[in-house]
Amino acid sequence: MTLEATIVCLDNSEWMRNGDFTPSRSEAQKDAVNLICASKTQSNPESAVSIMSMAGKKPEVLVTLTQELSKILSGAQELKINGKIDFSTTMQIAQLALRHRQNNHQHPRIIAFVGSPLKETKEELIQLAKRLKKNGVAVDIINFGEVTENSDKLEAFINDVNNNDESHLLTVPPGPHILSDIILQSPIVESGSGQFGSEFINADTDPDLAMALKLSLEEEKQRQERERKAREEANGGSTNSGTTTTTAPTESNMDVNFEDDPELAEALALSMATDKMEVQSSTTNTDSQPPQQQQQPPTDDTSSEAFKDQDFLNSTLNSLPGVDPNRIKNALENLSKKDEDKDKDNEKK
């Protein structure tokens, strides 16, 4: 499944109290959110999900982009019903949050649940869609509840935001069906989530099974994450290239962040220049060491001259236990004669 950063926007307006979905629009939405978030996090361990509310005093980010399924589901459960939705403002806030995602390789996506009337006109939604498309943000919308009033507007919105069939509109009329089951078989939940099966558990009808499913999904995600980290550590420990690959994105991110602050950029450049000077200095010291080592031979010459001193030689040999000074003297004299003979032969040549 595609590596994505997904912001799920939830309708928490007063309209969500209606009971035309089982058991209510709000509860049906919660079940569907559980399905979508589990699908996104399980299909790719690097994908991240965020939760936003669309109603109340203002749209609000409840959970920032994260890969922790338990944190995502917990934030969705804390949603409070209040006021009317502000669809346009929600889309703009979500787009801004996606622009500042940490992993730029993640494809930005917004999934919005719309279960109450939209205050925006069709023209306003079209303009909003064009801005989202320009910034490469894909949008999926689940239109349920107020289908008659919102369908025309949302169809126009999706038509303008759609790029390479990456955006989708799912319209679900009220009825005895379960919202999450319909979403499960729609393009919004891609084939990578087929592991959940068509028998997705309703948390209200069977809470024990729903909790077991949630825990198993979380354990599977943690297992995949451990395997991924183990592979990265193995690759990084075996070769130096792995370390270089790991640190490179951090350096590039620093360059991007410093572009807006010339003083920080200058300080970074100066520090890098200082590091280079220190490296060059250490290299120069290393290169200068061999000449110092070459100066050691004169010390050897001095020691050889000392051995030519008879008094020094006698005192040294006499101080050594078990050593016959006369034998040592004879050996040294023989060596000296051989050296003299070699010198004479060289002079004749």
Curated annotation (Swiss-Prot):
Keyword annotations of the record: Proteasome, Repeat
GO biological process: proteasome-mediated ubiquitin-dependent protein catabolic process; ubiquitin-dependent protein catabolic process
Start and end residues of each VWFA domain: 5-188
Alphabetized InterPro entries for the sequence: PSMD4, UIM_dom, VWF_A, vWFA_dom_sf
GO molecular function (one): polyubiquitin modification-dependent protein binding
Source superkingdom: Eukaryota
Keyword match Repeat: yes
Segments forming domain UIM: 204-223, 259-278
Disordered as annotated region, ranges: 219-257, 274-349
GO CC aspect terms: cytosol; nucleus; proteasome complex; proteasome regulatory particle, base subcomplex
Keyword Repeat appears in the UniProt entry: yes
Function: Binds and presumably selects ubiquitin-conjugates for destruction.
Quaternary structure, from the entry: The 26S proteasome is composed of a core protease, known as the 20S proteasome, capped at one or both ends by the 19S regulatory complex (RC). The RC is composed of at least 18 different subunits in two subcomplexes, the base and the lid, which form the portions proximal and distal to the 20S proteolytic core, respectively.
Family from the record: Belongs to the proteasome subunit S5A family.
The protein, known as: 26S proteasome non-ATPase regulatory subunit 4
Native organism: Dictyostelium discoideum
High-level lineage: Eukaryota, Amoebozoa, Evosea, Eumycetozoa, Dictyostelia
